[in-house]
Design a protein with these regions (language model features):
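Carbohydrate-interacting regions of secretory-pathway proteins
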Residues: 1-214
Length: 214
C-alpha cells in the first residue's frame, strides 16, 4: 500500500514465508536556484587524520609525507563534517589492479579503479557506480597521480577526470551499494573506500554551498 511517500508491503517467498517491508520514495532534490558557493576548505591537512574518522575498529589509514595513505584493505574513512551540495577536488593514486572509491554524501560512489584501456562502464574509473557511465576513458593508469573535480548539486553530478569532463550534469538515480545510509535528502560526509586494498589520496579540497555544512 502507498501512503504519501511511504510504501508498505509483504513479500512471500516460494517456501511460503512472509516478510514485511517499508520503503520511502527517494527525494527529487531539485534546487530552486543555482548554488552560491562558500570558501574552499582543505579536508586533509597532510599531517594527521584531523577531521576524519575510520569506520570500524582497525584503522589502517596514515598520513605519510602529505599523502593520505591506505596501506592495505581495512576500514573505510569518512569526514566528520557533512555536506549538502559541493564542489570537490581530490587527487588519487592506486597500484596495478587497485580498487577504491569516493562516496559523495556517503551514498553515491565515484569509482576509483584500475581498468586499463577498456571501454568505460558504470563500475569503471570515474563512473557513478552502478548508474552513470563515463563518456571516455582518460585514465593515466596505475602508480600515477590523477585528479577528480566533482560537482554535486541535488542529484545532479558532474565528474571531471584529469581535466576532462566524463560525466556532465547527469542525474544520479539512487544510492550505491555500501552507502552509509539511504537518507538521500540529508547531508552526508565524504567517504573514502579503504576495504579493497592500497590507495592514496592528497590535496582534498571541498567548496560547499553556503549554509551547506553540518
Amino acid at each position: 500500500t502507498l501512503a504519501g511517500e511511504v510504501l508498505n508491503g509483504t513479500i512471500t517467498t516460494p517456501a511460503g514465508e512472509q516478510h514485511r517491508f517499508t520503503g520511502t520514495r527517494a527525494p527529487l532534490l531539485r534546487r530552486a536556484a543555482a548554488p552560491t558557493w562558500d570558501a574552499p576548505v582543505t579536508l586533509f591537512n597532510g599531517k594527521d587524520l584531523t577531521g576524519w574518522a575510520p569506520l570500524g575498529e582497525n584503522n589502517q589509514w596514515k598520513a605519510v609525507d602529505g599523502v593520505l595513505t591506505n596501506v592495505k584493505g581495512g576500514a573505510n574513512l569518512v569526514t566528520t563534517a557533512k555536506y549538502t551540495d559541493f564542489k570537490l577536488h581530490i587527487e588519487f593514486k592506486y597500484p596495478k589492479g587497485g580498487n577504491s572509491g569516493v562516496y559523495l554524501r556517503g551514498r553515491h560512489e565515484v569509482q576509483v579503479e584500475d581498468n586499463g584501456d577498456r571501454e568505460p562502464q558504470p563500475d569503471h574509473l570515474g563512473g557513478i557506480y552502478g548508474f552513470l557511465v563515463p563518456n571516455e576513458n582518460v585514465s593515466r593508469g596505475p602508480d600515477v597521480w590523477q585528479t577528480f573535480d566533482i560537482t554535486l548539486v541535488g542529484r545532479r553530478v558532474t565528474v571531471a577526470l584529469n581535466g576532462k569532463t566524463i560525466i556532465g550534469d547527469q542525474t544520479i538515480p539512487g544510492i550505491t551499494g555500501g552507502a552509509l545510509d539511504s537518507n538521500e535528502g540529508e547531508p552526508g560526509p565524504i567517504f573514502l573506500q579503504g576495504d579493497h586494498g592500497p590507495v592514496a589520496y592528497r590535496n582534498i579540497v571541498i567548496t560547499p554551498v553556503k549554509n551547506g555544512v553540518r
